[in-house]
Structures are given as structure tokens and as C-alpha cells.
Amino acid sequence: MELWFTEHQDENLRFSIKVKETLVVEKTPYQHLAILDSYQFGRVLVLDGILQTTEKDEFVYHEMIVHVPLFTHKNPKDVLIIGGGDGGSVREVLKHSSVERVVLAEIDEAVIRNSKKYLPTISSALDDPRVEIMIGDGIKYVNEHKNEFDVVIVDSTDPIGPAVGLFTSDFYRAVYECLREDGIIVAQTESPFIYGKLINKISKMFKEIYPITKAYIATVPTYPGSLWTFTMGSKKYDPEEVDINSIPRIQTKYYTPEIHKAAFVLPKFVKDIFDEV
């Protein structure tokens, strides 16, 4: 008998993968968690029925949400990651030699615990001494810390359940206060094929708060529509003005200095979504 996992990406769209084995299923205080071993994408993390990351393509998302803002900033030392309990973003942040401290604010300890056990290639850096793990509400943490971080990475789930508050103007304004005078925020902002209205709304909120707001893209095969957007707000540095020849070569599988520059060249329909008044 064949076992398949199907994600309902939209009322008219589903995505299925063939499963070898169910490794863990857990009802946490916040969500339903499952880690499955699939034939095509290796082990996959699923939260509330939505695929979050896979061993085969996770590097695209994690490299792009991290290296674009960190190489835009001139000297990132303190980095806050909100969400991201699988540890992939932490792993990528620690490839930057300037980083002295990473705070991971994850509301659900079960994500961290199960990722450490079942997703070791993704969670491999969570025990690094530079990492501080804060189990709790990332919004509350941001509101309690002012002028403390160089980069804030919003590595959230989709805008449902515990992540809803991470897609609001109040939150983005609180992050502004949490950042230092040359700080940068980057947030994953969903698929332009599915969440066009949400992307436009977020773009407007960022533009009201951050002097420099830019959008960039990457291709993540297991995410809805495969094309994924990220929105960056910066107090000082323009990511498109980075001298790509000065970006040091680090060990990556997707990100390169050339990709850094190319990611800001948006398809017209995506640019229209971000620019619509």
C-alpha cells in the first residue's frame, strides 16, 4: 500500500509527496507537528498540514532569507531569528564570521526538539555556543528589546495560527525599534501566485516604516507555486548597492554574489504586486 502526504495549498491546489515512513506525529500546545520521510525530498517537516521544509530543497530558502540581509549589512554581530525552530536559518547565520550572537525566538519547543532528533542536517548549529534559544512569543520578545540587533529575520510559518501576529504593521514597527540605527529586517512573504494581496499589504507596511524597502525572490520547489518572495526593510543599507565583488565566498548551494544581485530582478507581475499603491 502506498502512503502519500497531501498539502492543501489553496482551495483549488494540492501538492502531494509519496511517503516512506512517518517518523513522528505530535499535537503540541500550538499546532499539529509531523516529520515524514519521503522518497523524493527526504525528511520533511509539516506543521498544521503545511509543509515547512524538506531535506532536499531547504538550502534555497534558508540561504536566501539569511545571506541577502547579512551581506547587505556591513558588520552584523547580533542577529534575531523569529520562528525558524528547525534551525536552518541559524546554521546559515553562523557562516558569517562577524556574528557574535544569534537569538532564536521560537514559540513551540516541540519544533526544536523534533528537528534536533529527526532533521540533524538542518538543526546542526542549534547547540553552537553563540546561539541563545528563547522559547516563547517572538512578538513579546521584540517589544521588550530596543536598539539591540543588527538583523532581524522573520522565519515564520504561513499567516495562520501562531504566526498571524508576525504579519502586522504593529509588529514591523516594533522590529524597527528593536533594530540598531543601521539595522535590517527580512521576512518571508509567501508566493506571488497564491498570496498576491498579502504581499502587496506587507510591502505597503514596510514602505511606511523603513526608508529602504526591497523585494527579492527565490525558487523553492516544494512551496506553493515554487516562486517565493522575501521583503527587506533597511534603515541604511540598500541591498542592490552591495558590491558583489566584495562578498566573501562561503559554503553554499544556492546563494552566490551573482544570485544576490539577480534576486532583486523581479518578474513584471511580481513587481506590480509590490509596487501597486
Swiss-Prot record:
Location in or out of the cell: Cytoplasm
UniProt keyword Cytoplasm, yes or no: yes
Subunit-level organization: Homodimer or homotetramer.
Function: Catalyzes the irreversible transfer of a propylamine group from the amino donor S-adenosylmethioninamine (decarboxy-AdoMet) to putrescine (1,4-diaminobutane) to yield spermidine.
Annotated active site: D155
GO aspect biological process, one term: spermidine biosynthetic process
Top-level EC class as recorded in UniProt: transferase
Species lineage: Bacteria, Bacillati, Bacillota, Clostridia, Thermoanaerobacterales
A GO molecular-function descriptor: spermidine synthase activity
A UniProt-annotated Pfam family: Spermine_synt_N
Binding-site positions, S-methyl-5'-thioadenosine: Q31, E106, D137, G138, P162
CDD domains hit by this protein: AdoMet_MTases
GO cellular component, one term: cytosol
Binding of spermidine, residues: H62, D86, D155, S156, T157, D158
Protein known as: Polyamine aminopropyltransferase 1
Gene3D superfamilies recorded: Spermidine synthase, tetramerisation domain, Vaccinia Virus protein VP39
PABS domain location: 2-235
Reactions this protein catalyses: S-adenosyl 3-(methylsulfanyl)propylamine + putrescine = S-methyl-5'-thioadenosine + spermidine + H(+)
Record's keyword annotation contains Cytoplasm: yes
EC number: 2.5.1.16
Gene: speE1
Keywords: Cytoplasm, Polyamine biosynthesis, Spermidine biosynthesis, Transferase
